[in-house]
Swiss-Prot record:
Binding site for Mn(2+): 212, 231, 268
Purpose of the protein: Involved in the gluconeogenesis. Catalyzes the conversion of oxaloacetate (OAA) to phosphoenolpyruvate (PEP) through direct phosphoryl transfer between the nucleoside triphosphate and OAA.
Similarity comment text for this entry: Belongs to the phosphoenolpyruvate carboxykinase (ATP) family.
HAMAP family: PEPCK_ATP
Protein name: Phosphoenolpyruvate carboxykinase (ATP)
Pathway(s) annotated for this protein in UniProt: Carbohydrate biosynthesis; gluconeogenesis
Catalytic activity: oxaloacetate + ATP = phosphoenolpyruvate + ADP + CO2
Pfam families: PEPCK_ATP
Keyword Cytoplasm appears in the UniProt entry: yes
Record keywords, A-Z: ATP-binding, Cytoplasm, Decarboxylase, Gluconeogenesis, Lyase, Manganese, Metal-binding, Nucleotide-binding
Organismal lineage: Bacteria, Pseudomonadati, Pseudomonadota, Gammaproteobacteria, Enterobacterales
Subunit structure as annotated in this protein's UniProt entry: Monomer.
Domain of life assignment: Bacteria
Organism: Pectobacterium carotovorum subsp. carotovorum (strain PC1)
């Protein structure tokens, strides 16, 4: 049997033997039948919900497993990858020997041999000259469905000459019994070989490992070509003006980039090259915990046939209880991007960005709701990737927990963070783009900055009115802040005004400044990082 040039014999080149059958780039209709088959058991089997989407469980792994991420250290990667065992920074790029890689590959190929396999050929990246052609191999129907949702679906013509640049072999059912003597973290593994151009997955069923795996690879390849690779959402206005939104979980990235006046380019992963900003993906991977039709109608409306729900609670009658986080707070849904109405068509790309927005949810109550950044401050705050959450303590007191994640996506960076900052600023300068730091968190009132005020701030950035505003400088962080903005409560623009006394703010500001300084020290082992210290806060 031959399908599009793929035969069971051809898979022997990957080390997969005696394949019973190949289901190549199956239709959504076929996947719908396959993943609900009564012959399936355990995590393989999905159930149909009243919304029309199929729901699956991913087992004990309801999120990525960063401690089980490995990269083969060889001549290709030795001097380029930002390794976990080198320099001052802690990251998830754990080195793997060629010998251990060979063993892990044998485990996965043995698991996939003799099976009926699903093969999905897809693109990562909307621009033909920089996209990755990726071949996914799995024995699980819903994992093929996830890939079909999340990556860019080739046309029939594009499939005819499809040659994979990268191969992902998902052996979720196999684990590594020799992990201890090999010095690994556990029996589970997500391993990359940049020379062989293969990703191996073992022990974890979580679909996001395939999505973020290829994002990590793009994060390795593109900056080395001078193309910015970004963990951000992006949209475009009626006049073709593009904005990108960086931010960690809970900062409002998805909410604020979803705007009825603007078309969505994408919600999570983008590149920026000589032509402009482009999406890496062909779908969205949205959180669904406490999802409601009223609060997020776009996402709720996207959950229908062909969408794939993960780790949600499905009642006996097929209804989904989105408020139930008993399996995980990280309940998700993947769906093709065309399930959202207001998107850029037919290709998820637009021109150069003129507005770059860093979102932070500062629970310390120090940072202003908005500030305009200099070029050096842009790099500094991009490298810092700060946000903070309020976490309850045993005594019932809520204390902020700071998070610093380089480039607002440290888990997915393969190169030193300063390389991403340099490429981003180079692209911004060429496009005449301006960066802003927007705090969607708290201030001295103890209340979170209202979504109304935050949307007013975003509107002022996008329509340019913030650039006409009178500015003053906030001490300690040396940030330029507006004294007034249309549609925004003027009493909140200077965070000092939200405290009973300036001294109260000053005390908190000194504390937060020291946290920034301590965190940034890890970048000073690179000359580019050391040069940026002056752009940070002063104590």
């Amino acid at each position: 049997m031959q399908i599009n040039g793929i035969t069971p014999q051809a898979l022997t080149a990957y080390g997969i033997h005696d394949v019973r059958d190949i289901v190549y780039n199956p239709s959504y209709e076929l996947l719908f039948e396959e993943e609900r088959s009564p012959t399936l058991q355990g995590y393989e089997r999905g159930i149909e919900t009243q919304l029309g989407a199929v729901a699956v469980d991913t087992g004990i792994f309801t999120g990525r497993s960063p401690k089980d991420k490995y990269i083969v250290r060889d001549d290709v990667t030795r001097d380029t990858v930002w390794w976990s065992d080198q320099g001052k920074g802690k990251n998830d790029n754990h080195p793997l020997s060629q010998e251990t890689w060979t063993h892990l590959k044998q485990l996965v190929t043995t698991q996939l041999s003799g099976k009926r396999l699903f093969i999905i050929d897809a693109f990562c990246g909307a621009n033909p000259d920089s996209r990755l052609s990726v071949r996914f191999v799995t024995e699980v129907a819903w994992q093929a469905h996830f890939v079909k949702n999340m990556f860019i679906r080739p046309s029939d013509e594009e499939l005819e000459g499809f040659e994979p640049d990268f191969i992902v072999m998902n052996g979720a059912k196999c684990t590594n019994p020799n992990w201890q003597e090999q010095g690994l973290n556990s029996e589970n593994f997500v391993a990359f070989n940049l020379t062989e151009r293969i990703q191996l997955i073992g022990g974890t069923w979580y679909g996001g490992e395939m999505k973020k795996g290829m994002f990590s690879i793009m994060n390795y390849l593109l900056p080395l070509k001078g193309i910015a690779s970004m963990h951000c959402s992006a949209n475009v206005g009626e006049k073709g003006d593009v904005a990108v939104f960086f931010g960690l979980s809970g900062t409002g990235k998805t909410t604020l980039s979803t705007d009825p006046k603007r078309q969505l380019i994408g919600d999570d992963e983008h590149g920026w090259d000589d032509d402009g900003v482009f999406n890496f993906e062909g779908g969205c991977y949205a959180k669904t915990i406490k999802l409601s039709k009223e609060a997020e109608p776009d996402i709720y409306g996207a959950i229908k046939r062909d969408a794939l729900l993960e780790n949600v609670t499905v009642l006996a009658d097929g209804t989904v209880d989105f408020n139930d986080g008993s399996k995980t707070e990280n309940t998700r849904v993947s769906y093709p991007i065309y399930h959202i109405q207001n998107i850029v068509k037919p290709v998820s790309k637009a021109g150069h960005a003129t507005k770059v927005i860093f979102l932070t949810a500062d629970a310390f109550g120090v940072l202003p709701p908005v500030s305009r950044l200099t070029s050096d401050q842009t790099q500094y705050h991009f490298l810092s990737g700060f946000t903070a959450k309020l976490a309850g303590t045993e005594r019932g007191v809520t204390e902020p927990t700071p998070t610093f994640s380089a480039c607002f996506g440290a888990a997915f960076l393969m190169l030193h963070p300063t390389q991403y900052a340099e490429v981003l600023v180079k692209r911004m300068k060429a496009a005449g783009a301006q960066a802003y730091l927007v705090n969607t968190g708290w201030n001295g009132s103890g209340k979170r900055i209202s979504i109304k005020d935050t949307r007013g701030i975003i509107d002022a950035i996008l329509n340019g009115s913030i650039d006409d505003a009178e500015m003053q400088t906030l001490p300690v962080f040396d940030l330029a802040i507006p004294t007034s903005l249309p549609g925004v409560n003027p009493d909140i623009l200077d965070p000092r005004d939200t405290y009973a006394s300036v001294e109260q703010w000053q005390e908190k500001a000194d504390d937060l400044a020291q946290r920034f300084i301590t965190n940034f020290d890890k970048y000073t082992d690179a000359p580019a990082g050391a040069a940026l210290v002056k752009a940070g806060p002063k104590r």
